[in-house]
Regions:
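Accessory nucleic acid-recognition modules appended to NTPase machines
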Residues: 1-135
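Short amphipathic alpha-helical segment that frequently serves as the phosphate-/nucleotide-binding helix
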Residues: 4, 152-156
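Switch/connector loops and helix/strand junctions flanking conserved nucleotide-binding motifs
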Residues: 86, 148-149, 176-180
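Conserved beta-strand segments of alpha/beta enzyme cores
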Residues: 114, 166, 181-183
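Active-site ExK catalytic segment of metal-dependent nucleases
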Residues: 135-146, 154
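Short, conserved loop/helix-junction motifs that constitute active-site signature segments
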Residues: 159-162
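Domain-level recognition of nuclease-like catalytic cores that cleave nucleotide substrates
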Residues: 173-194
Length: 194
């Protein structure tokens, strides 16, 4: 690593962007706006170092309709969310949804599932997994479903999927339910299931 400062700033950028779709070129552009000139090839190399050293997991996108893995716009999740708190030195309430998404990813990974982030039309599905029985499952993660806009967005993405595999919404809501084949589960209950 030739530029330690750029590498450190890149790792902080990724930590602040957990649960967001990113690419080396848009990271490079964002860092250039912050007066840090770093080429997207260097960004790609530094990300590879962070993934290979088990600081981040890289999760590819999957086009649900076309049934194929996409080559760009991955998401990155931290192996330990404590790294984020240590490096960024702050906790911001608006990040809780992304932190919850990171926790759900870690649990899906722990369960041995193959995990992708999903895309169906203009909608994003937080996680598509292939379980031990080689069956698919779909997950949306939201801090709370109490906001009607959030509920509509999360439910509509899952309803857009035209198969009969299980579909879940994971949130911090205490009251959970099943609606139109979509099971809404509390994060703590879900974590303790298996």
């Amino acid at each position: 690593i030739q530029n330690i400062r750029s590498f450190d700033n890149l790792s902080k950028f990724l930590m602040g962007a957990i649960g967001s779709v990113v690419s080396p070129s848009n990271i490079s552009k964002a860092m250039k706006q912050d007066k840090q000139d770093i080429h997207h090839n260097t960004v790609e190399k530094y990300i590879e170092y962070l993934v290979n050293s088990y600081v981040f997991y890289q999760v590819a996108r999957f086009d649900i309709k076309g049934k194929q893995q996409l080559a760009t716009q991955e998401k990155y999740y931290l192996v330990d969310i404590g790294f984020r708190n240590l490096k960024l030195g702050k906790f911001q309430y608006q990040d809780v949804g992304h932190i919850l998404e990171n926790i759900v990813y870690l649990e899906l990974n722990r369960r041995g599932y193959q995990v992708w982030i999903g895309k169906i039309g203009e909608y994003e599905v937080d996680f598509i997994v292939k379980n031990a029985l080689n069956k698919f499952e779909y997950y949306q993660v939201a801090w709370s479903m109490s906001d009607p806009k959030t509920a509509e967005r999360e439910i509509h993405a899952l309803k857009s999927i035209g198969d009969n595999y299980p579909k879940y919404i994971i949130s911090t809501d205490i009251i959970t339910s099943e609606m139109e084949g979509i099971e809404h589960k509390n994060i703590v209950d879900w974590l303790l299931e298996k």
